[in-house]
Amino acid sequence: MAQSKLYPVVMAGGSGSRLWPLSRVLYPKQFLCLKGDLTMLQTTICRLNGVECESPVVICNEQHRFIVAEQLRQLNKLTENIILEPAGRNTAPAIALAALAAKRHSPESDPLMLVLAADHVIADEDAFRAAVRNAMPYAEAGKLVTFGIVPDLPETGYGYIRRGEVSAGEQDMVAFEVAQFVEKPNLETAQAYVASGEYYWNSGMFLFRAGRYLEELKKYRPDILDACEKAMSAVDPDLNFIRVDEEAFLACPEESVDYAVMERTADAVVVPMDAGWSDVGSWSSLWEISAHTAEGNVCHGDVINHKTENSYVYAESGLVTTVGVKDLVVVQTKDAVLIADRNAVQDVKKVVEQIKADGRHEHRVHREVYRPWGKYDSIDAGDRYQVKRITVKPGEGLSVQMHHHRAEHWVVVAGTAKVTIDGDIKLLGENESIYIPLGATHCLENPGKIPLDLIEVRSGSYLEEDDVVRFADRYGRV
């Protein structure tokens, strides 16, 4: 019997606020390089090398779509495989969208879905792939498999799964019926769980047939399935994106896959996985899984430590030094600095809530912002002016646009700029500049083979990004 098609489904939603100031609403942790040269999303996809599967399906928030597309493009994995959620509705609806898409793509069969989170670290990738292979026969037989992480300490930050009887399966394949899903326990209870040998950490990773998941969702949460079917019935293809119907999806209830299906179904089984797994839920957990110096420090960027022990020090720009401290987390970005006791980093989320309550922007966006055409860095700002460094990738261009409240000056630093102002086209080289009057229709393009760098000086009564009227845009943002 031929093996069923396997669709990896990578859930790339979430804001990762406990890793602020690196992780922010518009650039959360799954898109960051926290370990090595690849982002967490890219590492998750590369982990599938050696697993016979189709191109991965990525589910993300609409505002992250160009980040996901660029990171997939860098891996040569970009197809029409990015499902956009108009708003987060937790994991049960997200997986339902992916299941409906998989069934639509393979109508002749009931394909398998390997559901993964984009922000997990797995040290032993061979063990991960072995667990997936172990789970395949159970999923093909109609079971809903969850992967249980073999615990190595009494962690209170994870939910647990209590295993039941051994589930019937092929020789050398080990899975257990799920006896119970358990919420995050206190320390004493977690210690008892680990000592019993009957409990696993709940990883949030799953393997099942798309049709079986939809059957169980229809049985237990038909309202979720109905909303997702309506959302998928009016899909709007957009470049490499699958844009679901916004009104239908916003009507969908929020629910996790555990609550909606896994805790209710009679067909849930747990496959153990002992692979050095972490969900990197805090700065302390990132410190724990990273390579340490002899003094127990983890350092990134331009860092000098003196008599510093067991600390995490991250410098995004410029030099960061520490003297005579221990057990600290120090994270410096271009517009914010975090200094925290390593044992109190769970409260970083409260700082983020305060920043949001104060009406500040540092919880939402970095100083450096990525766009489909490149990026910009807000260098300076004051009363009625703002200075940015803009980088446009070769062959890319900004939308044809105008502004009601600001004029702009552009000075080319490197590369060649093709500038159109009210129909007049000019080519600018290094050290050349141009003025865009308030209200002028204009466009910036990079016709060259190297990145275009320019300095933009905005002046006017209102300088925010929402002062823009787009007339044409190659990225569908009109």
Swiss-Prot record:
Pathway: Nucleotide-sugar biosynthesis; GDP-alpha-D-mannose biosynthesis; GDP-alpha-D-mannose from alpha-D-mannose 1-phosphate (GTP route): step 1/1. Its EC number is 2.7.7.13. It catalyses: alpha-D-mannose 1-phosphate + GTP + H(+) = GDP-alpha-D-mannose + diphosphate. Belongs to the mannose-6-phosphate isomerase type 2 family. Involved in the biosynthesis of the capsular polysaccharide colanic acid. NCBIfam families: GMP_PMI, PRK15460.1. This is Mannose-1-phosphate guanylyltransferase. The lineage of its organism: Bacteria, Pseudomonadati, Pseudomonadota, Gammaproteobacteria, Enterobacterales.
